[in-house]
Design a protein with these regions (language model features):
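Acidic, glycine-rich two-metal-ion catalytic cores of nucleic acid-processing enzymes
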Residues: 135-318
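Intrinsically disordered regions, especially transient/low-confidence alpha-helical propensity segments
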Residues: 15, 29, 70, 87, ...
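Helical catalytic core of nucleic-acid polymerases
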Residues: 34, 47, 81-102, 258-354
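A short, conserved structural fragment
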Residues: 109-128
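Minor-groove-contacting beta-hairpin "wing" of winged helix-turn-helix DNA-binding domains
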Residues: 125-139
Length: 354
């Protein structure tokens, strides 16, 4: 096993990975029979011998985990998955957990780690709301990576569970934090929105959206800030709608498409079904809406400020910092919270903290 050098280079576990490909089942069967103890597997059916049976059998939960480790490995062998090892964190009956993964996944992770199939960095907790808090990080070890290489299935054989929720309701968020997902009862409007968005995602799935000039389906974004990578694949070519503050009238924006996370230069190179595209660009949309509300006309780029104010910064970085500050301020309750949220969004020693 290899030590995870950077636990922050990670993403949350995706609880909706799925595949019925026979070779996927064969790999999971091999891991199940060869590495998981009888205290987990039981004598038949993949359920433990004692205690209540999980809503989703252990072996199916193992399949979801292995598939997500496989996808993360394909994206980047260094990429880790964040997973909670606290039983209380698993909400089996949540609408945001359509496959009903449960705390039963915890002993599976421990068994795979003990068998040398995972690299694992334990989670940390420094107190409520502390910035150092994080969940356990896992990724495929060298031994599991070898099994992935030998497997007779490919990335396109890994899909998403059809019942995944795509209409998301979140509560009010604290500064610099994403609001928590809120359970809700469907109404006519949410049912209609879900059907409409499902049709849109079906259209995206039936289209080939790509940047033909890329050697690999990955784009590095914001290298001058905190570099991250945008992967171009089936998972990142789909959308969900997110509403805020436990209110169906708040936000409702579309998120998920990889094209939303790259700059205009990259977007100008997008092809759909081998045909070039033209983007209708609404510059400074949020600021323009505020101007319109005040009965004023916005002229020029609202994020373009005189270089004399930021002589030490490159123009491109200056614009990105100004834009981030403005958008943070729009969503803040007061100046002090806007400044604090802006500074906290950057890593230590970053220029954005100056």
């Amino acid at each position: 096993m290899t030590e995870i050098q950077d636990p922050t280079y990670s993403r949350p576990i995706d609880v909706h990975r799925w595949s019925d490909h026979p070779e996927v089942k064969a790999l999971v069967d091999d891991l199940w029979e060869g590495y998981l103890p009888e205290t987990i597997t039981g004598e038949a059916g993949g359920n433990a011998r004692t205690g209540p049976k999980p809503k989703t059998p252990f072996k199916k939960q193992l399949r979801v985990l292995i598939l997500d480790l496989y996808v993360a490995w394909l994206d980047d062998p260094e990429l880790s998955i964040g997973v909670s090892m606290s039983p209380n964190a698993w909400k089996t009956n949540s609408r945001y957990n359509a496959l009903h993964l449960s705390k039963s996944l915890i002993p599976i992770i421990k068994a795979l780690d003990a068998a040398g199939l995972l690299d694992l960095a334990k989670g940390s907790y420094a107190g409520p709301g502390a910035r150092g808090n994080r969940t356990t990080r896992i990724r495929a070890s060298g031994e599991l990576q070898t099994k992935f290489r030998e497997a007779k299935f490919i990335r396109d054989d890994v899909t998403r569970f059809e019942g995944e929720e795509i209409i998301i309701l979140r509560d009010a968020k604290e500064a610099n934090k994403v609001g928590k997902e809120v359970e809700y009862v469907d109404i006519a409007e949410t049912i209609a929105m879900r059907e409409e968005l499902k049709a849109y995602n079906d259209l995206l799935a039936a289209s080939f959206i790509d940047i033909a000039t890329l050697d690999k389906p990955v784009i590095e974004v914001h290298p001058e800030l905190e570099a991250s990578h945008v992967h171009i694949n089936a998972d990142t070519a789909r959308s969900r709608r997110v509403f805020s503050r436990s209110n169906w009238e708040m936000n409702g924006r579309f998120y998920g498409g990889w094209w939303q996370r790259v700059n205009g230069d990259w977007r100008s190179k997008i092809f759909i079904d081998d045909q070039p595209t033209i983007e209708v660009d609404f510059k400074g949309l949020h600021v323009a809406m505020l101007y319109a509300k005040a009965g004023m006309e916005l002229k020029g780029d609202p994020y373009d400020v005189p270089l004399t104010l930021f002589q030490a910064y490159p123009p491109e970085l200056t614009r990105k910092l100004v834009k981030q500050l403005v958008l943070t301020a729009i969503n803040a309750k007061e100046k002090s919270s806007a400044y604090r949220a802006f500074r906290e969004s950057f890593p230590s020693a970053h220029r954005g903290k100056e």
